[in-house]
UniProtKB/Swiss-Prot annotation:
Key words of the record: Acetylation, Heme, Iron, Metal-binding, Oxygen transport, Phosphoprotein, Transport
Organism of origin: Rangifer tarandus
Function summary: Involved in oxygen transport from the lung to the various peripheral tissues.
Protein name: Hemoglobin subunit alpha
Lineage start: Eukaryota, Metazoa, Chordata, Craniata, Vertebrata
Stretches of the chain forming a coiled coil according to its record: none
């Protein structure tokens, strides 16, 4: 459960991301594909090279979903229900991959916002991404 301080930290950090969210989403995906090559198996139809239009487009989808989630921190299950259905029933993404993407998102944010990425903000973003991952995997059961 996110505390009031966590919610404030997440909103403030995501506010600093601003219009860079799609680019950061794409960068986090690239980092994930490079660091955890098995994740590429879910994207056999994608050009996974650096700067790929498909990776950029999917990064934007990820960023838009996170932006939506940040705006509805008190109702993540309702906000992300459609995405949970998609990933569980149609795409059948192994739940561990959400943790891997969360990790690369944190690394990406830390690299772009070093002065804002305090231990408290890191912890709050980590909790937020863990909550998002939990919601996205909730319909696997």
């Amino acid at each position: 459960v996110l505390s009031a301080a966590d919610k404030s930290n997440v909103k403030a950090a995501w506010g600093k991301v601003g219009g860079n969210a799609p680019a950061y989403g794409a960068e986090a995906l690239e980092r994930m594909f490079l660091s955890f090559p098995t994740t590429k198996t879910y994207f056999p139809h994608f050009d996974l090279s650096h700067g790929s239009a498909q990776v950029k487009a999917h990064g934007e989808k990820v960023a838009n979903a996170l932006t939506k989630a940040v705006g509805h921190l008190d109702d993540l299950p309702g906000t992300l229900s459609d995405l949970s259905d998609l990933h569980a029933h149609k795409l059948r993404v192994d739940p561990v991959n959400f943790k891997l993407l969360s990790h690369t998102l944190l690394v990406t944010l830390a690299s772009h916002l070093p002065s804002d990425f305090t231990p408290a903000v890191h912890a709050s973003l980590d909790k937020f991404l863990a909550n998002v991952s939990t919601v996205l995997t909730s319909k696997y059961r």
